[in-house]
Amino acid sequence: MKRDPTKGRKTPDHYARKAKTEHYPARSVYKLQEIQKKHNVLKPGNAVLDLGCFPGSWMMFAAETVGRGGKVTGIDLKKVATHMPAQATSLQEDIYEIDREALAGTLGPLDVVLSDMAPDTMGNKFTDAARSFHLAAAALDLALFLLKPGGHFVCKVFQGEDFQNFVNMVKAEFERHKVFKPETCRKDSKETYVIGFSKKESTHVGS
């Protein structure tokens, strides 16, 4: 019997095919679209930071949403090669090592910080969740430094032992919060998104 060469091979799902048709570099764009449709975190004219921006789907959608009067800056370890609207730029940086004072001087106070960062998974759910928590905590720390009062924060984090701790961290710094898992997440995925709405006045930009 001949071996089926397609057996065990992952085939692109509906959202991956749709992304290709609509000229987005990855299916992850539809997660942000769902978040935007449900929670309206992005507004025309907003200044936005996208952490973990590679390959550029969130940057592209955010730039389209904020329009030419807005600005979107992406940061990732990998270089983004996707062609972007004029109001979007990317930096190849490590979030753990970036000079946030210099970044604040370049970007100014932000309206929204997005983070779709995820660790390179090891196949151990406890290790993967712990590494995701540390990335999310780093994203939150940077967001609190850069966001203006009233600004919003959207962050991916894996469910695990530290998940509720992270939710509580966001809850403490924002007027309200929401835990949201887009329908476009893969069924077996442990990822979810924690959204902080309206950064509290007591958490100062650049503090």
Curated annotation (Swiss-Prot):
GO CC, one annotated term: cytoplasm
Annotated keywords: Cytoplasm, Methyltransferase, rRNA processing, S-adenosyl-L-methionine, Transferase
EC number: 2.1.1.166
Keyword rRNA processing in record: yes
Highest rank taxon of the organism: Bacteria
Region named Disordered: 1-20
Cystine pairs: none
Positions annotated as active site in the UniProt record: 156 (proton acceptor)
Catalytic reaction(s) noted: uridine(2552) in 23S rRNA + S-adenosyl-L-methionine = 2'-O-methyluridine(2552) in 23S rRNA + S-adenosyl-L-homocysteine + H(+)
An MF annotation (GO) of this entry: rRNA (uridine-2'-O-)-methyltransferase activity
Binding site for S-adenosyl-L-methionine: 56, 58, 76, 94, 116
InterPro entries linked to this entry: RNA_methyltr_RlmE, RNA_MeTrfase_FtsJ_dom, rRNA-MeTfrase_E, SAM-dependent_MTases_sf
Record Pfam families: FtsJ
Localisation per UniProt entry: Cytoplasm
Coiled coil residues, start to end: none
Function: Specifically methylates the uridine in position 2552 of 23S rRNA at the 2'-O position of the ribose in the fully assembled 50S ribosomal subunit.
Family in the record: Belongs to the class I-like SAM-binding methyltransferase superfamily. RNA methyltransferase RlmE family.
Record-given protein name: Ribosomal RNA large subunit methyltransferase E
Organism the protein comes from: Desulfosudis oleivorans (strain DSM 6200 / JCM 39069 / Hxd3) (Desulfococcus oleovorans)
Lineage: Bacteria, Pseudomonadati, Thermodesulfobacteriota, Desulfobacteria, Desulfobacterales
Name of the coding gene: rlmE
